[in-house]
Amino acid sequence: MEVKEAGYVGEIYRISGPLVVAEGLKARMYDLCKVGEEGLMGEVVGLVGQKVLIQVYEDTEGVKPGDKVENTGMPLSVELGPGLIRNIYDGVQRPLPVLKEVSGDFIGRGIEAPGLDRKAKWEFKPLVKKGEKVKPGEIIGTVQETEVVEQKILVPPNVKEGVIAEIYEGSFTVEDTIAVLEDGTELKLYHKWPVRIPRPYVEKLPPVVPLITGQRILDTFFPVAKGGTAAIPGPFGSGKTVTQHQLAKWSDAQIVVYIGCGERGNEMTEVLEEFPELEDPRTGKPLMERTVLVANTSNMPVAAREASVYTGITIAEYFRDMGYDVAIQADSTSRWAEAMREISGRLEEMPGEEGYPAYLASRLAEFYERAGRVKTLAGNIGSVTVVGAVSPPGGDFSEPVTQNTLRIVKVFWALDAKLAARRHFPAINWLQSYSLYVDTLKDWFAENVSEEWNELRRWAMEVLQEEANLQEIVQLVGSDALPESQRVLLEVARIIREVYLIQYAYHPVDTYCSVQKQYDMLKAIKQINDWFYQALEAGKTIDEIAGVEGLEEFARAKFEEDYKPAMEAALEKIRKNLLGE
């Protein structure tokens, strides 16, 4: 970060926590500055008369009025190129392994580290020839970054259209020139992009393909589309982070960007320990081979939380521009909103609801609206799916962050503390949650899974809804007072809840459930439901029906790698015991 000519150096007038007020400094909004003798990284967030307001992304202890402030004249940008995958960054794209080498286990202040390794060499294979015309965003070659991910090297979207004068093949570092345009523009393996500016695309496409997560309650009842937005609000201990980890592990995106924003450091450690060992069900390679981590834990500087969210989404858009499906997990957007509230307080702005700034809704929308399935500048189709966790204090969904998030996102997975207390995981409340993608995705499920999928889904939801209606009566007078047919319905609902909805995140087989297996299980439960009613008509008592032999074997079949024989044997046993030969 070189500093420009005179006028780009000023001095500190006042300091208030992470907010520094400087004077005598030429600056524009969102310019990157170096504050104090140690050159702490900061960003211009306001201009009042001759004074410049800077939020500092590092601890401001020891900085004093009169210290110099330098403006780099550049906005906060990330480096996009080979070397992103498998890396773990802080909120402003400094690689944490590099910072550890420089300053030990605790990050020192004012340390600069490039986002991409300058020494690593990458094998570049050109896809265009000398004399060919290239447009912004076009793919000019590839680099095999990991066994799973082939990085496509793009003409930066902010470069003018031109003709290739020279293009080279071979091993290069990210700083080496790999192609030259006729107007003299040099293209490298990487380019920089300002984090607050969404990357351009040709057009947005309708979200008609589901993001398969391998979690039964999500895929069957509340699916999210590729290029969609989802929120997971829930009180502490209800399983937000485990659900996010499950999505990062098993969703059928080609790239996963995981942002730990203001949450516990141990949760990021868990990702770092587990992902290299876990196998991707589609490629058979470690999950880390497709993951980028942005860690900004709760004990890191507050201001950098905002940067980490923008850094993560910009990296996701870069992979989208190559034609990949990207899933981005932000855990948790509430911590980012709290950071905004703190900075807003320091800026002495008029507070909105619960002390959050008035622009909370527009900032959240700015982030979620960068999701989408698009036609890229290169003509490919890529998508960014955003899943944001929200941590409302005390599990109160009426607080501003949750409410503003719900206005923007189309899928709401409501985590319920009562379900978590009953050890029902994933603790997603099937009565409160919703997905607005169900109608747009039903054709995909009908074509790729079964024509009956949507009918089965509707039937199961009706059973669960009916159970909730009967639950009030049951709690008052007990289930014995109900007619037999309704008691059968309660039994079927129990099977749906305990066999289908409960899923074990730490069981090697049950942690991921393919869509075909989900369909087979739901169809089998519908079959059992039909047999129950037939047995009731044939004169069997409710106790005989509920205690029929074979139900336990059926419940255990989902834990088998090859589940079909076990499930069929259990179904046959249930049929014989209920209806005879």
Curated annotation (Swiss-Prot):
Transmembrane segments: none annotated. GO terms for cellular component: plasma membrane; proton-transporting two-sector ATPase complex, catalytic domain. GO terms for biological process: proton motive force-driven plasma membrane ATP synthesis. The keyword tRNA processing does not apply. Its main location: membrane. It is a peripheral membrane protein. Its EC number is 7.1.2.2. GO terms for molecular function: ATP binding; proton-transporting ATP synthase activity, rotational mechanism; proton-transporting ATPase activity, rotational mechanism. ATP binds at G234, P235, F236, G237, S238, G239, K240, T241. Keywords: ATP synthesis, ATP-binding, Cell membrane, Hydrogen ion transport, Ion transport, Membrane, Nucleotide-binding, Translocase, Transport. It comes from the Archaea. InterPro entries: ATP-synt_VA_C, ATP-synth_a_Xtn, ATP_synth_asu-like_sf, ATP_synth_asu_arc, ATPase_a/bsu_AS, ATPase_F1/V1/A1_a/bsu_N, ATPase_F1/V1/A1_a/bsu_N_sf, ATPase_F1/V1/A1_a/bsu_nucl-bd. It is found in: Cell membrane. The keyword Thylakoid does not apply. PANTHER family: H(+)-TRANSPORTING TWO-SECTOR ATPASE (PTHR43607:SF1), V-TYPE PROTON ATPASE CATALYTIC SUBUNIT A (PTHR43607). Has multiple subunits with at least A(3), B(3), C, D, E, F, H, I and proteolipid K(x). Component of the A-type ATP synthase that produces ATP from ADP in the presence of a proton gradient across the membrane. The A chain is the catalytic subunit. This is A-type ATP synthase subunit A. The lineage of its organism: Archaea, Methanobacteriati, Methanobacteriota, Archaeoglobi, Archaeoglobales.
